[in-house]
Amino acid sequence: MISKYRRTINKEEELSNFWPTFTDLLATVLMVVIMFLISSESMVGGVEQGIANSINESVKQTLKENCIPVEIDEANGDVTFGEAAFFDTDSYELKEEAKEMLKIFIPKYAETIYKDYGEHVSKIVVEGHTDDVGTYIYNLDLSQKRAFSVVNYIVSEEIGEYKYKDKLTEDIIAIGRSEAETIKDKEGNIERDKSRRVEIKYEVNINNEKDA
């Protein structure tokens, strides 16, 4: 009877010793998995940034070589067109000079983006921006229509055929930002002329997974 009781106690002690050890093991495995995921995400981010830097340099070089008069953000490669060159006040109809500018710029831009980096470019975004005059909803509608007007021309027959046009048509989207991203001076005052603009930018994804 005593022997049986001792065996029972020993089994309970073994179980009580087992669970803390098992829990520690699970915690260790979980920590390793978390560290691996963090490391992998960091590596992916680094690779994507490297690709983006290469694209930025290529785009800047292309614009310089072809004397295309647009602004480019040195940090992220965003290309900016001022409102005055593209639209009349309160209008979303593209000016003829805007069409001529896009007819020169877009073929060069598409070739630069897709020739060496096409498999990693997941999206081309055309954004319309306004100043803070008027209601947010009015500006949202205007900025969206302006972005769509640019996209519609870029993929239209009117602009003509150019290399990678089909690929660009698959990837391009139009977004209206309203007055959400106005440009401000050092004192924090809104620069309305600069805020009214259209931007063309790209997104990089080395996994090449398109957003739904």
Report the location of each language-model feature.
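Periplasmic peptidoglycan-binding/anchoring modules of Gram-negative envelope and division proteins
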Residues: V59-L63, I72, F87, S91-V125, ...
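Well-ordered, non-membrane alpha-helical segments in soluble/globular domains
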Residues: A52-S54, L102-P107, F148-V151
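Short, small-residue-rich loop/turn micro-motifs
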Residues: E74, F81-A85, G128-T130, V204
